[in-house]
UniProtKB/Swiss-Prot annotation:
Membrane topology type: Multi-pass membrane protein
Family: Belongs to the Ycf4 family.
Subcellular location per the Swiss-Prot or TrEMBL entry: Cellular thylakoid membrane
Source organism phylogeny: Bacteria, Bacillati, Cyanobacteriota, Cyanophyceae, Synechococcales
Alphabetized UniProt keyword annotations: Membrane, Photosynthesis, Thylakoid, Transmembrane, Transmembrane helix
A Pfam family matched in the record: Ycf4
InterPro entries linked to this entry: PSI_Ycf4_assembly
Keyword Protein transport annotated: no
Single GO BP term: photosynthesis
Protein name: Photosystem I assembly protein Ycf4
Originating species: Synechococcus sp. (strain CC9311)
Gene Ontology cellular component list: photosystem I; plasma membrane-derived thylakoid membrane
């Protein structure tokens, strides 16, 4: 049974880099809020600088708007991290003759089923430079290429080649792009 089924988990947005960005935006938003309140109240609420000396109407008000924008952005980032958008699995079932690609969306799960007989090849893309792309995808008859790797940090080249070769061997199709 194990030889008939291959399941690959896919990492979503619950990564350390995303958590650090959300944390920095949250802390920055709180800092802008305290600076705005210090300007309004005329008292220093922050240990650094002297925000009480700022005139409220132009500077303090703008800092309050920055804190509102940071709160909205941080709320979105924490929601995406909590829901773990983009996580899921790639399930290859030879006995049923179907490939199921499932991901967790923002509002609802996303699932795509592809018959194995429609898969023409496993494609490995490597593009270095400013916009680096390293991904494994399925070349499907009558459709666009279906990406299988996670979005974000590129995989090491050795792991990318190994994953592509293992998948092509399992599905019995060609490996393209190397």
């Amino acid at each position: 049974m194990a030889a008939e089924l291959l399941e690959q988990p896919v990492l979503g947005s619950r990564r350390l880099s995303n958590i650090l960005v959300a944390l920095m935006v949250t802390i920055g938003g709180i800092g802008f809020l305290f600076a705005s309140l210090s300007s309004y109240l005329g008292r220093d609420l922050l240990p650094l600088g002297h925000p009480a000396g700022l005139v409220f109407v132009p500077q303090g008000l703008i800092m309050g708007l920055y804190s509102l924008a940071a709160a909205l952005l941080a709320s979105y980032l924490w929601a995406v991290i909590t829901i773990n958008v983009g996580s899921g699995s790639n399930r290859f079932d030879r006995s049923a003759g179907v490939v199921t690609i499932s991901r967790r969306g923002f509002r609802q799960p996303i699932s795509v089923e592809i018959p194995i007989k429609d898969i023409q090849a496993v494609k490995v893309e490597v593009r270095d430079g400013f916009n680096t792309r390293r991904r494994v995808s399925l070349r499907v008859r009558g459709r666009r290429d279906m990406p299988l790797t996670r979005v974000g940090e590129p995989l090491p080249l050795a792991q990318l080649e190994q994953d592509g070769a293992e998948l092509a061997r399992f599905l019995g199709v060609n490996l393209e792009g190397l």
